[in-house]
């Protein structure tokens, strides 16, 4: 990306420590994403607008309003037997919890927040029967899904947001 955020620039770092570092390495978009300072990193301005539109579509206009409800499309491809094979038989094998969340919610309506930060915890807005919900799920593909300090911060922030807007949570 083209975005950077830092307190002291690369020139000062170079003069004080002798370390040669680029602006992107010091405070570029990926660095900020991994530090939990931003919600998402996207490739283009159009993708950024799409992400924001999708995110805001799940939130009410204020904390006094209800979240928008959309007409839920019947899920013709709903196959409960897919849930039977979701988890591997090997208890040491990882699995992507996002696959389950996609099946639980309405089709194509999952917006993950802070996907590049604390990847061991998934926080996402979605819909069930057209109603906005917040999904919080451990992701065994990263740190075996264990909650560390970053994941706890990420989850707490997301839960506070859902609470402020009266959006129910699915754990």
Segments predicted by a language model, with ranges:
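Terminal amphipathic helices with adjacent charged low-complexity linkers/tails
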Residues: 44-101
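Phosphate-binding glycine-rich loops and adjacent basic patches that engage nucleotide phosphates
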Residues: 9-21, 57-67, 114-124, 155-164
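Short C-terminal domain-edge/linker segments immediately following a structured domain
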Residues: 28-30, 71-74, 164-168
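Glycine- and other small-residue-rich loops at beta-strand/loop junctions that grip anionic moieties
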Residues: 40-41, 90, 144
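Non-catalytic terminal/interface segments that mediate subunit docking, oligomerization
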Residues: 93-171
């Amino acid at each position: 990306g083209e975005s950077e955020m830092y307190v002291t620039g690369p020139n000062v770092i170079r003069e004080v420590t002798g370390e040669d570092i680029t602006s992107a390495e010091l405070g570029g978009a990926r660095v900020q994403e991994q530090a939990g300072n931003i919600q998402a990193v996207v490739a283009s301005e159009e993708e950024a607008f799409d992400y924001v539109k999708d995110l805001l579509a799940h939130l009410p206009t204020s904390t006094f309003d209800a979240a928008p409800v959309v007409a839920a499309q019947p899920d013709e491809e709903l196959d409960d037997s897919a849930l039977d094979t979701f988890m591997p038989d090997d208890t040491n094998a990882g699995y992507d919890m996002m696959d389950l969340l996609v099946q639980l919610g309405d089709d194509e309506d999952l917006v993950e927040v802070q996907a590049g930060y604390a990847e061991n915890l998934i926080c996402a807005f979605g819909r069930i029967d057209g109603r906005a919900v917040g999904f919080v799920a451990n992701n065994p593909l990263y740190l075996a899904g264990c909650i560390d300090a970053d994941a706890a911060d990420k989850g707490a922030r997301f839960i506070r947001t859902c609470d402020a807007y009266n959006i129910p949570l699915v754990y």
